[in-house]
A protein has these predicted regions:
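Gly/Ala-rich beta-loop-alpha elbow adjacent to hydrolase catalytic centers
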Residues: 1-9
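Short, hydrophobic alpha-helix immediately C-terminal to the catalytic nucleophile
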Residues: 10-14, 166
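Flexible "cap/lid" loop of the alpha/beta hydrolase fold
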Residues: 14-52
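Conserved alpha/beta-hydrolase catalytic His-Asp/Glu region
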Residues: 34-35, 55-112
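Short beta-strand/loop motif that positions the catalytic acidic residue
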Residues: 114, 120-122
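Acidic beta-to-alpha connecting loop that harbors the catalytic carboxylate
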Residues: 124-126, 152-153
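Conserved alpha/beta-hydrolase "acid-adjacent" motif
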Residues: 127-133
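Catalytic histidine-centered segment of alpha/beta-hydrolase-like enzymes
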Residues: 149-163
Length: 180
């Protein structure tokens, strides 16, 4: 699971209801361990940031430069026109719900006992943004292998370089199969 999908995967692993032999958490978001009021302020920041990017092409392109975040062979203008139109379809309520649920989901105090091989990936360019998540995952799932991906930002590997993502995933899955 990548980003918010990583939050879903983290919860699935913690509950241990579905057997999972190996898991890749790619830049997964972990729940804030902060007071309610602080989490509400962070939610306001996230909603404001999203709305600014959705309503300003300049801000969107400053946050996600087209030359970096457009898949090879695709037209950046068409891609960003489509993204801009898509981002404007989100209601305020949806934006709030997405950010609140991704950052504040409930986990048991201790995860279920699972034998899952877990790796947590993050882009080296997002390392500072993921410090809290990495620390949480290391503590919560001590068996996790942490792996920085060189010269990548958040979700860049899977979105812009899917073939490279597949090579990393295949390497992890093959390595795990050999450890049995």
């Amino acid at each position: 699971g990548c980003s918010m999908g990583g939050a879903c995967l983290t919860r699935m692993l913690a509950l241990g209801k579905i057997p999972i032999s190996r898991a890749i958490i790619d830049g997964g978001i972990t729940p804030y361990q902060l007071p309610f009021l602080v989490r509400k302020l962070l939610l306001a920041r996230d909603v404001l940031s999203f709305k600014m990017a959705a309503n300003s092409r300049k801000i969107l392109e400053a946050a996600f430069p087209p030359e970096r975040f457009t898949t090879a062979g695709h037209d950046p203008k068409k891609e960003y026109d489509a993204m801009e139109a898509y981002l404007k379809t989100f209601s305020d309520r949806t934006i709030r719900n997405v950010f609140w649920s991704a950052n504040n989901y409930a986990l048991p105090k201790r995860p279920a006992k699972i034998g899952t091989k877990i790796t947590y990936w993050y882009g080296d360019d997002e390392k500072n943004d993921r410090k809290r998540d990495i620390r949480f995952i290391r503590h919560y799932f001590p068996q996790t292998r942490i792996h920085g991906i060189p010269k990548m930002a958040h979700a860049e590997l899977v979105m812009v370089h899917p073939e490279k993502f597949c090579r990393y995933a295949e390497k992890f899955l093959t390595m795990q199969a050999e450890e049995r």
